Amino acid sequence: MISQEEKPTYVRRMFDAIAPTYDFMNTVMTAGAHHLWRRTAAREIVASDPAVVLDLACGTGDLSFAVMQEAMAPCTILGVDFSPPMLDLAQAKHAQLREKRFPIEFLRADVLALPLPDASVDVVTNAFLLRNLVNLEEFFTECHRVLRPGGRFVTLEITHPPVPGFRSAFELYFNNLVPLLGKLLVRHQEAYTYLPTSLQSFPNAPNLATALRDSGFAEVSYRYLGLGTVAVHIANKVT
């Protein structure tokens, strides 16, 4: 069992190790649906025509690229991650894009101590980050700090399916088959055992919405995707 003190270092080293096969495993585990989920989140991100979008724990850049594809008005996208191998892959994928509609900059930084001024971005977003954090309240406070008044927070995360029967089937797959796939396909059983473990104590979608409200966000809403296995939460900074 990983202690709360050890978790940040453990998670960073884990993502450094799985970076080369991260995209492949996401596609295998979700049958490609993770691309659709990111596009759905991206539509929520660009709905207010933001000038600056901050993608935290951007990984290999897929959410940043989805935002670039969905945006109707020009915007600047800043992708932040603490894993150099992940950022290297994001930059390589960006370089290979045929059409670069808007600027994307990738930066190594700690999502709990962002090197950005107060009220400097229009949207803060992230995909599959929250389960890996030790202190959600600290993270939400930092996101609230860098958002401009009227700014939007959009997060996409694995969740507990609300329908009991399907939840049992999902847990059977997630807790047993996913680690086996990690072992057989990419030889990273430990990382893909950590993945379902990280969900066990994570709040369900309604409770995550409550945590956002308690951290000062307003107009909080969420919707389930992937038969209730993931959820996108949307919240606004009023002042």
Which residues make up each language-model segment?
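Hydrophobic beta-strand segment of the Class I
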Residues: 22, 124-125
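Conserved alpha-helix/loop element of class I SAM-dependent methyltransferases that forms part
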Residues: 21, 30-51, 66
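C-terminal alpha-helical "lid/dimerization" subdomain adjacent to the S-adenosyl-L-methionine
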Residues: 9-10, 156-211, 215, 221
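Short glycine-dipeptide loop
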Residues: 73, 147-152
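A short glycine-rich, Lys/Arg-flanked "PGG" loop and its adjoining helix->strand segment in the class I
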Residues: 137-149
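Class I SAM-dependent methyltransferase SAM/SAH-binding core
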Residues: 52-113
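Core SAM-dependent methyltransferase catalytic element
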Residues: 215-239
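A short acidic, Gly/Pro-enriched loop at the edge of an enzyme's catalytic core
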Residues: 112-123
